[in-house]
């Protein structure tokens, strides 16, 4: 099994537990297995999401939603929670549905996976990766010849590719070598570069509910937005980046983002509220009389953006300027000039085409004995634990299926 990340570990454990006689070897090319698990979720590890109905769960996957429905019925968030609980790790649910270990420490998850692998008899080899695979008949039902990076050749009844996504994934070249189609990988879950005077100095400011859209597209999201020193981040931005991964890549990440800071109000509704405030409180300063749930410092910037001086009162605001303020509140346009990686959850879309994979077993339809799990597949979810859930699910399915084709003395 190639890839010592979440999917690879889960597959190796599932296989070894299902067939104690199988010889299961897990290869990790680096010396740091489970590295992504360690740093995800700000070091807390967002294990999964409290969305228990598979029909609802699949809606959080821009790629792979249809294909994951069956797998999630077999092993979804409920099974994930039970799996970790059965190994002494309790998970908690936060207000937004994200689930973390009660320790708030990813080391808990890392230790659990390492311990489960050791107890199941998985042989972990770090600093050793997979260099090549080819179909070959061997003893005891071996179907594949695997060449490791150090030159060692191993005959195996089954091989798993759980080597992750991204342009540099060795799994892509290995899959391509046996005939698989690779959907070109592009970034997903990224933040936006925005250089705008309305945001200067507001780093760390959070707007709890905004509406955003990429102008000229159908890409729209609602949720929290965070102002950063490079531009914009937060759940709404990350979800939009996931659903628009290919479209925004094609635009070279240069587009106009329209933000409704007064969501769910439309511009006309906001204008009427502002007119009412002007009539009722003509002597109040506009910069401090914020009728919406917009952070005070941001409201001051929006008022300035509408051409309203800091000391101006409502009485001095003309209808034209008031309309401009309503637009600033509900349809602020920001020029996006690029992207930055989301440090807590770095994901790509693209990978091995799902049409060429049996999603009930994760086995290749083109190369019997070859299996896939995790981000090497053309599957990705939005932020919130969904990508880890896909890793647990596909890893578990692959491990179970690989165990079913093992026999005494066979290796995987």
Language-model segment annotations:
Residues 1-26, 395-403:
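N-terminal Rossmann-like FAD-binding beta1-loop-alpha1 element of flavoenzymes
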Residues 2, 27, 130, 153-166, ...:
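Short hydrophobic core segments
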Residues 16-42:
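Glycine-rich FAD pyrophosphate-binding loop
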Residues 29-33, 39, 47, 51-54, ...:
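An anion/pyrophosphate-binding glycine-rich loop and adjacent beta-alpha core
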Residues 42-93:
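Glycine-rich active-site loop/strand segments that organize a redox cofactor
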Residues 126, 301-380:
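A glycine-rich dinucleotide-binding beta-alpha-beta segment and adjacent secondary-structure elements
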Residues 126-142:
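A conserved short coil-to-beta-strand element within the FAD-binding core of flavoproteins
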Residues 158, 162-178, 379-409:
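A conserved FAD-binding loop/helix module that cradles the flavin
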């Amino acid at each position: 099994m190639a890839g010592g990340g979440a999917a690879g570990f889960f597959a190796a454990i599932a296989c070894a537990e299902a067939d104690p006689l199988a010889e299961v070897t897990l290869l990790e090319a680096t010396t740091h297995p489970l590295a992504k698990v360690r740093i995800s979720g700000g070091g807390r590890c967002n294990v999964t999401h409290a969305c228990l109905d598979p029909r609802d769960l699949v809606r959080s996957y821009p790629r792979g939603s249809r294909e994951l429905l069956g797998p999630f019925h077999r092993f979804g968030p409920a099974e994930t929670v039970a799996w970790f609980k059965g190994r002494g790790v309790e998970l908690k649910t936060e207000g937004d549905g994200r689930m973390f270990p009660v320790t708030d420490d990813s080391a808990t998850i890392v230790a659990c996976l390492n311990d489960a692998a050791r107890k199941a008899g998985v042989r972990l080899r770090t600093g050793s990766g997979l260099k090549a695979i080819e179909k070959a008949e061997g003893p005891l039902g071996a179907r594949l010849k695997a060449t490791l990076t150090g030159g060692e050749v191993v005959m195996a009844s089954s091989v798993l590719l759980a080597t992750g996504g991204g342009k540099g994934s060795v799994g892509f070249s290995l899959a391509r070598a046996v005939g698989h189609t690779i959907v070109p990988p592009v970034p997903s879950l990224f933040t936006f570069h925005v250089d705008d005077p309305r945001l200067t100095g507001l780093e760390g400011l959070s707007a709890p509910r905004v509406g955003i859209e990429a102008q000229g597209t159908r890409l729209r999201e609602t949720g929290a937005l965070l102002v950063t020193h490079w531009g914009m981040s937060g759940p709404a931005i990350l979800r939009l980046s996931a659903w628009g991964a290919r479209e925004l890549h094609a635009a070279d990440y240069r587009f106009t983002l329209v933000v409704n800071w007064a969501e769910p109000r439309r511009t006309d509704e906001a204008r009427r509220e502002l007119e009412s405030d002007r009539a009722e409180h003509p002597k109040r300063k506009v910069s401090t009389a914020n009728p919406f749930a917009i952070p005070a410092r941001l409201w001051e910037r929006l008022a300035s953006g509408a051409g309203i001086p800091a000391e101006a009162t409502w009485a001095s605001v003309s209808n034209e300027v008031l309309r401009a303020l309503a637009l600033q509140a509900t349809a602020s346009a920001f020029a996006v000039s690029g992207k930055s990686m989301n440090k807590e959850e770095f994901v790509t879309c693209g990978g091995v085409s799902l049409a060429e994979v049996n999603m009930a077993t994760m086995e290749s339809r083109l190369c019997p004995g070859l299996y896939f799990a995790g981000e090497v597949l053309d599957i990705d979810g939005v932020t919130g634990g969904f990508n880890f859930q896909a890793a647990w699910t596909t890893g578990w399915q692959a491990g179970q299926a690989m165990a079913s084709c093992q026999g005494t003395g066979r290796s995987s």
